[in-house]
Design a protein with these regions (language model features):
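Alpha-helical transmembrane segments and their helix-helix packing motifs
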Residues: 2, 6-181
Length: 181
């Protein structure tokens, strides 16, 4: 009800304010945090769907599995975007590709990492100061650049996402240690 309207209005006010800021370090830190959090949350939701929600492996590819994938798309406000991006049947591998490797999906891990790279590179600080940050970022960035969805699924989606979350958490702690301590 009204609490939702108030929250939505506050979110929109923040977005409007953030998008009208000077493109200085404050702006880049806001969006650096935004994309780190978005990547972490998207990865965790993908992992929960894939690893936790399905009762047993026997259900993979069945009606319950497909319904849960569609619910994941809707929960991330991405169902329509997915349908525009992919033709044919809604499959788990297409949805995994959409949320991991699709650079046009604002919720995808790849999109988030590309924006993290952009905002980190835009900070006005000496490159030596952020060398450690780049080493952590390199791991995460290369995983969304060099992989294809088949190799991720063969490796194990849960394992891939778990590694991604670990790497993004490490990156976040490196940024905190270098800039805020």
């Amino acid at each position: 009800g009204s609490e939702m309207c108030i929250r939505d209005r506050q979110v929109n006010m923040f977005r409007g304010s953030a998008n009208s800021l000077l493109r200085n370090d404050g702006y880049h830190f806001i969006f650096l945090g935004t994309f780190i959090e978005r990547a972490d949350n998207s990865a965790r939701l993908l992992d929960v769907k894939y690893f936790v929600l399905l009762p047993t492996a026997d259900y993979i590819g069945g009606n319950l599995d497909n319904l849960q994938w569609i619910i994941l798309l809707r929960s991330l406000s991405s169902f329509r975007a997915f349908r525009w991006a992919y033709e044919g049947d809604v499959t788990s591998s297409k949805i995994a590709h959409f949320f991991i490797l699709n650079n046009d999906c604002s919720r995808s891990l790849s999109f988030c990492i590309n924006n993290i790279v952009y905002h980190l590179n835009s900070l006005k600080c000496s490159p030596e100061k952020i060398t450690d940050i780049y080493s952590g970022l390199k791991k995460v960035h290369s995983s969304v650049k060099t992989e294809n969805i088949e190799s991720i699924i063969d490796y194990g989606l849960h394992e891939y996402v778990t590694n991604f979350v670990s790497n993004i958490t490490y990156l976040d702690s490196q940024i905190q240690n270098h800039f805020f301590k």
